[in-house]
Regions:
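P-loop (Walker A) phosphate-binding loop of NTP-binding proteins
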Residues: 8
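Short glycine-rich anion-binding loops that position phosphate/pyrophosphate groups of nucleotides
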Residues: 78-80, 102-104, 152
Length: 169
């Protein structure tokens, strides 16, 4: 059983994924962390040097490697759903949960984090709103389950996922 968590930056994918993995005794992985560990540089640096297109190529290669594993919880990068190939990989190898998160929550959570290349030197609220508009339908298309995270802690969201997995497999 593989559980894949998608959603925008600031939705809590990594936090929720770690809790779900612990509850279900599965290994936890994060695509962004894997990319940083394999390259030895930050996502921010990759964006600066290779641009978003270069990063997306690395992201797809990493996803191919990760979906070949079994019994994992995988937190993905916010833009993983942009590529149709990625959406197909996710759908074919596990159950996909979309963490639907209100814009104000994303703004609040990402305001403390300076390692968000897409927000660098921009108005974060406008960028996040634009990303939400362009990606929301892709998240929905890619997902088996949509989890509303509004006014919920990471533990509450994780518990919803665990219940769904236990009830529906």
């Amino acid at each position: 059983m593989n559980i894949f968590i998608v959603g925008p930056m600031g939705s809590g994918k990594t936090t929720v994924g770690k809790i779900v993995a612990g509850e279900l005794f599965l290994d936890f992985h994060d695509t962004d962390e894997k990319i940083e560990n394999s390259t030895g540089v930050t996502i921010d640096w990759i964006f600066d040097i290779e641009g978003e297109a270069g990063f997306r190529k690395r992201e797809t290669a990493t996803l191919k490697e990760m979906v070949a594993m079994n019994s994992i919880v995988l937190a993905t990068g916010g833009g993983i759903v942009i590529e149709e190939e990625n959406r197909e990989l996710l759908a074919s190898r596990g159950t996909v949960f979309y963490l639907h998160t209100p814009l104000n929550t994303q703004v609040e959570r990402t305001s403390k984090d300076k390692d968000r290349p897409l927000l660098k030197g921009q108005d974060p609220e406008k960028v996040l709103a634009d990303l939400q508009k362009s990606r929301q339908s892709l998240y929905e298309e890619a997902s088996d389950h949509i989890i509303n995270t509004e006014n919920k802690s990471g533990s509450e969201v994780a518990n919803e996922i665990v219940k769904l997995v236990k009830n529906y497999g």
